[in-house]
Curated annotation (Swiss-Prot):
Forms a complex with ATG13, ATG29 and CIS1/ATG31. The ATG17-ATG29-ATG31 complex interacts with the ATG1-ATG13 complex. Forms a complex with SNX4 and ATG20. Interacts with ATG11 and the conserved oligomeric Golgi (COG) complex subunits COG1, COG3 and COG4. Interacts with ATG9 (via N-terminus); required for recruitment to the PAS during autophagy and starved conditions. One of its GO terms (cellular component) is phagophore assembly site. Disulfide bonds: none annotated. Keywords: Autophagy, Coiled coil, Cytoplasm, Membrane. The lineage of its organism: Eukaryota, Fungi, Dikarya, Ascomycota, Saccharomycotina. Autophagy-specific protein that functions with ATG13, ATG29, and CIS1/ATG31 in response to autophagy-inducing signals as a scaffold to recruit other ATG proteins to organize pre-autophagosomal structure (PAS) formation. Modulates the timing and magnitude of the autophagy response, such as the size of the sequestering vesicles, through interacting with and regulating ATG1 kinase activity. Plays particularly a role in pexophagy and nucleophagy. With ATG13, is required for ATG1 activation by autophosphorylation of 'Thr-226'. Recruits ATG9 to the pre-autophagosomal structure. This is Autophagy-related protein 17.
Length: 417
């Protein structure tokens, strides 16, 4: 065993191992890079699938909102039924009520204003009421045709939107993009999936081959270093020399095999890269269609906001009508109370007239009694003077003895109520 040979073996093993490490490291970097691209592509496909599934659910949700939320609840129940039928009927009813009450008041003569000296037409109860809010509901009813046209226009837009969402968006675009995805990347295209998995398995196998070659070269290099150790006995060292010598002769073939494996790595990477490039192009094209669908959803969202704005306007009209109905109800109640109070006032006037008549009767009776008493008093005075006047001097009761003026003065006035 020649020490020079040992040194040569060590140098050959070191150089081969170093060169192999450089080649394998570079190859491994390329493998890692292409695997990252493969993983990134697979992740992007998963995201695209998630996006498409989400859009399909959003399409169903949008269609449900249109059919049930807008079509049934908003247009049919709230607008057509609650506003154009129930609300309009209620406004017509209360407008008729208040008009009838005003006409009734206009036909009732104010008995309290009738005078024998006044030959003009007597006033009516309608002359004493405010008419500012009598036609509130009539004014609102005049706005109803405008609201009807708005509802009809929005209904046409709604029907057009439902058709587009159902036929163009859901049945056509979403269905088409779903079928394309399943055809190109989904479970319907197992071949494409198998190709990607096959490339991945090939690269993994090639990585193992590279690892085995590197392991073999490392073991050989360790053996050459062991030959330099003088502590092992000669027999064992001689046996190790033969092994190392044989392995040294195989270094060329091993290195050649390494190059072949690396060539396979590069071919696989190239094929996988071309495969990914084609798939990425297909995904990009499909993603463009998905982006167009997203834009359609955004446009539909803007249309929904239009429905919201119209709904707010109609709600505002409805609330205003409700307030006017309440005002009209209160006015009708006031007119009823006014007529009832007028009836009570007529009774009160009659009562006062009766009281005045009673007062007149009492006063006339009192006047008659006073006149009778006064006549009796006059007679008594005359008798007194006849009997006693001759004997009584005037000065004893100055101005009183022969005074025949009445003892009472009666002035009264009973108002004509």
């Amino acid at each position: 065993m020649n020490e020079a040979d040992v040194t040569k073996f060590v140098n050959n093993a070191r150089k081969t191992l170093t060169d192999a490490q450089l080649l394998c490291s570079s190859a491994n970097l390329r493998i890692v890079d292409i695997k990252k691209k493969l993983s990134s592509w697979q992740l992007s496909i998963s995201k695209l699938n998630f996006l498409i599934v989400g859009l399909r659910q959003q399409g169903k949700f949008l269609y449900t909102i249109l059919k049930e939320g807008i079509g049934t609840k908003l247009i049919q129940k709230q607008w057509n039924q609650a506003v154009l039928v129930v609300l309009v009927d209620e406004m017509k009813y209360w407008q008729y009520e208040i008009t009838s009450k005003v006409q009734r008041l206009d036909g009732i003569v104010n008995e309290l204003s009738i005078s024998e000296k006044d030959d003009t037409d007597p006033s009516k109860l309608g002359d004493y009421i405010s008419r500012d809010n009598v036609n509130l509901l009539n004014d609102k009813l005049k706005e109803v045709p405008v609201i009807e046209r708005q509802i009809e226009n929005i209904k046409l837009q709604y029907e057009n939107m439902v058709r587009k969402v159902n036929k163009e968006l859901i049945d056509t675009k979403l269905t088409d993009v779903t079928q394309k995805f399943q055809s190109k990347f989904g479970i319907d295209n197992l071949m494409e999936t198998n190709v990607a998995e096959q490339f991945s398995r090939e690269l993994t196998d090639l990585e193992k081959d590279l690892a085995e070659i590197m392991n073999s070269l490392t073991q050989h290099f360790d053996k050459t270093l062991l030959l330099q150790d003088k502590k092992i006995d000669n027999d064992e060292r001689e046996e190790l020399f033969k092994v190392v010598q044989g392995d040294d002769k195989e270094l060329y073939n091993i290195f050649k095999t390494l190059h072949e494996v690396i060539d396979d790595v590069d071919k696989t990477i190239l094929n996988l890269g071309q495969f990914l490039q084609a798939k990425i192009k297909e995904k990009t094209e499909l993603h463009s269609e998905v982006s167009e669908i997203i834009n359609d959803f955004n446009r539909n969202l803007e249309y929904l906001l239009i429905f919201k704005d119209i709904s707010n306007l109609i709600d505002s009209f409805k609330n205003s009508c409700t307030q006017d109905i309440q005002t009209t109800k209160e006015l009708c109640e006031f007119y009823d109370n006014f007529e009832e109070s007028y009836g009570n006032l007529v009774l009160e006037a009659k009562r006062r007239k009766d009281v005045a008549n009673r007062m007149k009767t009492i006063l006339k009776d009192c006047e008659k009694q006073l006149q009778n008493l006064d006549a009796q008093d006059q007679e008594e005075r005359q008798n007194f003077i006849a009997e006693n006047g001759t004997y009584l001097p005037e000065t004893i009761w100055p101005g009183k003895i022969d005074d025949f003026s009445s003892l009472y003065t009666l002035n009264y006035n009973v108002k004509n109520p």
